């Protein structure tokens, strides 16, 4: 178990995040329980799981981490409507944070993308975006928000001037 967590810290430390310093920081994962399958590279942290690396914070009731060839491929944080998953991180060259919440947050390492599904909300400085789904491109600081397919939940955007 400890061997896996140390290896996981090394793998995740190589990820590209909004702050270059974050990628050099060790990763810390806390949860009430963990299931690790070293043959598939899959691990599941449950019970108020929290991932920290530098300024990055990812928290949810359940966080799944997938590795391939000793590199992290993705992290999926699963919350609920009552207690959504949360993503927080500082932005490079800015004194503000990006804070996102949703029922499910998926971080795709290769693409540098954060995908939010289910009552998605992202706050960036004084601006906020919300909708059913939200895709956040970390590297290009680009946000795509969509309402639900039934048209009952529209996209909302608030900008502070």
Protein language model regions, located:
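Mature-chain termini and adjacent capping regions
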Residues: 1-161
């Amino acid at each position: 178990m400890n061997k896996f967590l140390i290896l996981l810290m090394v793998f995740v430390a190589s990820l590209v995040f909004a702050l270059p310093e974050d990628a050099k920081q060790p990763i810390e994962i806390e949860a009430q329980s963990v299931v690790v399958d070293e043959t598939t590279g899959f691990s599941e942290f449950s019970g108020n799981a929290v991932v920290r690396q530098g300024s990055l914070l990812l928290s949810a009731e359940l966080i799944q981490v997938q590795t391939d060839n000793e590199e992290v491929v993705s992290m999926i944080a699963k919350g609920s409507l009552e207690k959504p998953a949360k993503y927080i991180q500082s932005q490079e060259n800015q004194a503000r944070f990006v804070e996102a919440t949703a029922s499910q947050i998926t971080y795709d390492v290769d693409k540098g993308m954060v995908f939010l599904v289910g009552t998605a909300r992202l706050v960036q400085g004084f601006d906020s975006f919300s909708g059913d789904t939200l895709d956040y491109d970390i590297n290009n600081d680009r946000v795509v928000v969509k309402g639900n397919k039934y048209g009952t939940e529209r996209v909302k955007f608030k900008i502070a001037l």
